[in-house]
């Protein structure tokens, strides 16, 4: 891994622990979805991993923007994708503010299936003739169960 030693994880923040539809689910009248307990209002699945040298988000679902605002995230070093379902990819376009803030391209770590889905759903971000207002990203291929480094963290 580039001859550098990846650092230890300092903090892990669960950004969302809900279902693929979030909780409450539209039209559901079960006790969880109708509960007034704020713990039962859950955004779609995502986690933020922080080390001393960097911050990585795992999956950018439809709630990614709200999650970043809620946690006051000002810097993001990489995104790692677990799989190609829309509830894990839909927020990719919202990496743009990090492009502007950090003046850098966002590395996206993804399998070949996730890469294909991203290029299909966000084709404008991968076109040769880039124009303003599109996310600036660089896909870095990862394989299941292989170690890689993202944002200074060693991940598998």
Where are these predicted regions, by residue range?
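Binuclear metal-dependent hydrolase catalytic cores
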Residues: 2-156
């Amino acid at each position: 891994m580039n001859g550098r030693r990846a650092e230890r994880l300092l903090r892990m923040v669960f950004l969302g622990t809900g279902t693929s539809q979030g909780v409450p689910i539209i039209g559901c009248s079960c006790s969880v979805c109708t509960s007034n307990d704020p713990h039962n209002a859950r955004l779609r699945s995502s986690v933020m991993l922080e080390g001393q040298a960097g911050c990585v988000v795992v999956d950018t679902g439809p709630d990614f923007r709200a999650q970043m605002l809620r946690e006051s995230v000002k810097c993001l070093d990489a995104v790692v994708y677990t799989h190609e379902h829309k509830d894990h990819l839909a927020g990719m376009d919202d990496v743009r503010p990090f492009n502007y803030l950090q003046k850098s391209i966002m590395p996206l770590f993804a399998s070949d299936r996730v890469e294909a889905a991203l290029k299909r759903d966000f084709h404008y971000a991968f076109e040769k003739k880039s124009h303003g207002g599109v996310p600036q990203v660089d896909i870095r291929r990862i394989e299941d169960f292989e170690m890689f480094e993202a944002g200074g963290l060693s991940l598998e």
